[in-house]
Each structure stands twice: as C-alpha cells, then as structure tokens.
C-alpha cells in the first residue's frame, strides 16, 4: 500500500478515515452513519492502530478498554507516527483476528477522555509468518463453511421412489440373509441352476412370516407348494390366516408346516409384533397385575431356595477379594471392616411381601364428603 509522502512513518491510504456515504438508501441506514469500505483478508489484521488518544497518560485505561473484546498480546505507543497536537497514537496486537474485528467495530468513533478515537487495521506491521498463518486460517474457514453447505444441500435431495413391487422384493431378499431367494420363473429350464427354490412370488402369504437358515431341497413338496399357493389366493384363506395369527408361535408352526414348501422353516413371528393389537384398558391393567404377581412369586421362590444347592439363574456376582496386607494387625482391622460392611448391607429392610391389595387396604380411605 502506497503512502502519501513515501516514508515508513507517513500516513497510509488505508489509515485515513473515509467520509460518510450520503447516497445510501434510507432503509439501509443504521444507527450510526458509516462509510462504504470493503475489507479483504489481506487488509484485516490482528494489529490495530488507535489515533486521536488524548496525551494525558491514559495508556493503561486504553488497554483495559480494548481488553474487554479479547486477549491482547502486545501494545506500545508510536511516537514517530504523525498525529494531531496533544494526541497520541497507539498500536495494539490481539491474539485472535476475530477479537480485533470486534474491537475495531465497537471502539471506532468512541469518546475517550474528551477525544474521538479512530481505530483502523495496520497490516503493515505483520511479519511474513503471521500473514501466511492468517491466510491459511481463512482458507480453512472457507473450506469448512462450503463443506457444510454442500452437506445440507445433499441432505435435502429427495429420495427416488421404487418403481415396482418386484424390484423392491428383490432388494428386500438381497439385503436380508435370513430369507430364501425365490425364483422369478416358476418353471425353470435347468433345475440344477435353481438349487434352492422357495416360495414363489405368486404366493400371497406375508413374507415376514417365513425365515430359513439352510437352503431348501430342490425336489421336495412341489405339488404341495402349488396347492398352497392356489389356496392362499382366496380371501377366505387370508382371513383365516389372520385369525390364526393371534395364537402362540407353536400353533402357527404346526399350521405352516402343511402349507409352506420349505422343509427348514423357523417358528413364525407373532402378528402383534408387526401390527399393533388393540387391548382395552382393563385388560392391560389385569395383565400388569398378573406380571407383578409372577415376579413377586419368583422373587420369594429365589429367596427361600438360597440355602439349597439348586442352581440359580443368572451370573454370580464376584465376591470382595481378600488382600494380604503383610501385617497381622492390618489384616485383623481389614477383616473387622469387611464383617461390619456385611452386617450393614444385610440389615437393609426388605419390602413387604404382602399382595398389592393388602397394601391398598392398609391405608385408610378418605371419607366421602356429604353435601
């Protein structure tokens, strides 16, 4: 940047305060009248030049005022810099560039000890390493911001819909290893190619009820498969299938063995897992009460059989390891502490074993108020 008189101590062009813009629209004017000036990363700097400071020895107060906007690395007075009479010029270097931006915005044209401050950037005081670091930080910031914008743009893209039901079924079977991959052609030319024929697509049973671990045999139950598929197309059979789906999985397994052509079919999944089953409020309360009673009976059974030699369900908790302290007195003290801890833990009061009805009746009922 060229200077006005060509000397290093002269006033640079970017140090001169620009006049207020008078052609700005009314709706764009802020609270304070400002000039039109564009700052690039090359013009911004951690160094701030403060002009118009009254020469009353208020450097400490000035630094404290600027320290409100960020950490200051160094500061000094510029005696050789040309200034007005009875004023001084100071140079302050901030640790972060963002702190210098905020300080310049807040402290420019502010009153300080009767004088009007003029704050501007001073990039000519930067070293080559500081300028390189500033440019690298700016590049990293730009790449991070553009990457986030690209991420949000790609996130808002609509997902393409599936064209056909057959394609979706093929994708479903391809991603689910537990299902047999059915053949599209029900009458293959080479039976050796399709070594594991399972349910054809013409069968209208829900696919979520069938799962297999081992491949199905090729020549088994071919006649039964066609009969079951033809019978499953009728709505009456589907309605009967829905009615039987409420039974336990063991009964479902017996009914599917006669209709499914695969020899190795696991137990069918209950319909209540796939479709939500309506249950009245009273039934839900009764079911909860029954489960609480079962849990209570199981707990009392385990408590009564602790002394016996029966195997308990669940892993055994590890005991407190005994540590040898290599001293008789210390070992005696440690044993006393362990025994005391066992007494404290065993003396915890147990909850009452009575039924919930007895507990409810133990509390006195509130008398009904008569009007």
UniProtKB/Swiss-Prot annotation:
The keyword RNA-binding applies. GO terms for cellular component: nucleoplasm; spliceosomal complex. One of its GO terms (biological process) is mRNA processing. CDD domains: RRM_RBM48. The keyword RNA-binding applies. Residues 220-249, 343-371 are annotated as: Disordered. SUPFAM superfamilies: RNA-binding domain, RBD (SSF54928). InterPro entries: RBD_domain_sf (IPR035979), RBM48 (IPR039599), RBM48_RRM (IPR034264). Residues 46-124 form the RRM domain. GO terms for molecular function: RNA binding. Keywords: mRNA processing, mRNA splicing, RNA-binding, Spliceosome. As a component of the minor spliceosome, involved in the splicing of U12-type introns in pre-mRNAs. Component of the minor spliceosome. Within this complex, interacts with ARMC7 and PRPF8/PRP8. Belongs to the RBM48 family. This is RNA-binding protein 48. It comes from Rattus norvegicus (Rat). The gene is Rbm48.
